[in-house]
Amino acid sequence: MNDMCSARSGRLGMVLTDIIKSYWSLALFLVWMAVGVFPLSCYENDSMHLLAGCSVMANQGVTVPPPYSYFYDMQPLVSYVVVGLNAVFAWLTCEQLYCLVTWFAACFAVVGTVRFCRRLTLLPVHVLVFALLFLPESYACAMYPNSAVPAYACFVWAMCMVLDGRFVLAVALMGLAPLFRIDVVIVYPVLLPLLLFVYGRKKVWRCVALSAVAAVAVVAMVTVGCAAMGADPVRHTLGMYSSFDVGGQYSGQVKYALFTFYTIVSVVVLPLGVVVLWRRRSLLLLVTCLLPMLLLHYMFRRTGCAGKHWLYILPFVLMLCSTGWAAIAHWCNGRRGARYAVAALVVLYAFCSVRITIPPAVAKVSKAWVGNERQEGPFLTLFSEDLTPMKCRFGIGAGQFIPTADEMMIASGNVFYPFYIHAYKSNKDAMRREAKAYADTLPCYDIAALAWGDRIWYQNLLLDDGYAMTGKNDDGYVLRKGGSTVDCYYVHDDIPKGDAAAAYRTLKPLKRPGRPLLVVPETDARAYVMDKLVALGKAVRHARRCYEVR
């Protein structure tokens, strides 16, 4: 009996040892990623609008659809998940819960991505995790609440279930993912080549039939789910994407999103992975990788303005990049000089950075605010120059800020990215709480929103305090709690960025006798305008992001 127990203990110890050896790098990656998750604060203004609807339902009762949201038809399920969790964990705000949901989903997504890619490439876990470091969206997506992450987590685990032969569970997850975010279906055609991995190329028609069954089942689940939640993604979401595609208002930002998704390192390594798979005649794996990538690139060619839009192709990009890295490592064997050169380049990119200052003379007056509070995070300057207007600095730490439509990304120094985001979120959250500390001294006041982000960024703190939203229309809404009322006005005028005179002409008529008119700008651009009004004596600044119009 003792010998049997000893044998079992020995086998358990061997299993645990193998798990630790295989997955220590993945565990370290998840812990490192968690630094940027905190504080549990949203820095992206679109998600702030969705959160406002969650808070309104938490305070005033659940409705279908929510009384306030952001592109609800595209992402209906996430609102009710957050509100449901708030009913259970009432001591947490909807904003904190949405951050936690995104973080947990990102952790599951990373684990699923590594599991999926390891199954198809047979590469060690540490190689896959190393390649993830140079695909920043794999961890950046965890650091601000967004619906793409739970949708992606469901999708990647559905693909894992396909490889495991658990077809029913895979289809269930594929039906759940679009309810979190509908655009995940763009990459669903990858199911067919994955089924060929499972059943073999001799059973093509069986794979085609299973793909058709999955498609019908997914359409049925999404139709029923959206109908139950009062969402219509076909009519509203497809029309939205079509208008964005035709209008091209986001097309100029696509290149920044792609640069931050792939990074300059992966752009070099990924083609190498394609060549390696081609030479190995791993054509099915190559098709599996390239098919969803081509589909998503085509669909988002003018609208993929943030890294999260490209998140769904992460496992396929990772397989190509990790294959390229493995080929580089193999080539460096026995070549000491090459090994040191590659290691030096990797360390330089991952740990070192160049930062530049963008002065008004270079950025023009419309972008004079660029580079102030976005140069956050740890940065140790090793040397700098003052001879050029850019005032370049080279050092160790988070690199130059790269603007995307939704996310705060950096050009290099990715090892420090979680610390960069932690510092940025802490500072931004502190600014709106400073504004609230002053506004709480006023019984009643008005707020004017000069930009999209200003409409709800600060006001979410009031909703967290139990304020009720009433009278919402195209011009604003009213927040009430007891005897306190806050009237929120939307400014529809297209005020040129940096034009303080135009801003004041718009704000002045909104000021009512006996009621302070506050502006709490979420964006650097509007804060810059308000600072100019302070200098002109037409506004008073009570906190870093709290201004009162005179």
PLM features: what roles do these ranges have?
Residues 129, 156-157, 161, 168-182, ...:
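Membrane-interface alpha helices of multi-pass inner-membrane proteins
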Residues 37-48, 60-83, 95-96, 257-260:
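Membrane-proximal lumenal/periplasmic loop motifs of glycosylation machinery
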Residues 186, 290, 302-332:
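Hydrophobic/aromatic-rich transmembrane helices and adjacent perimembrane loops
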Residues 112, 150-174, 316-323:
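Specific aromatic-rich, kink-prone transmembrane helix
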Residues 110-114, 197, 262-294, 324:
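Hydrophobic, aromatic-rich transmembrane alpha-helices
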Residues 117, 348-478:
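Membrane-embedded, lumen/periplasm-facing catalytic core of multi-pass transferases
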Residues 44, 140-148, 306:
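Short acidic/glycine- and proline-prone juxtamembrane loop motifs at membrane-interface regions
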Residues 206-250, 256-271, 295-297, 352-367:
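Membrane-lumen/periplasm interface segments of specific transmembrane helices
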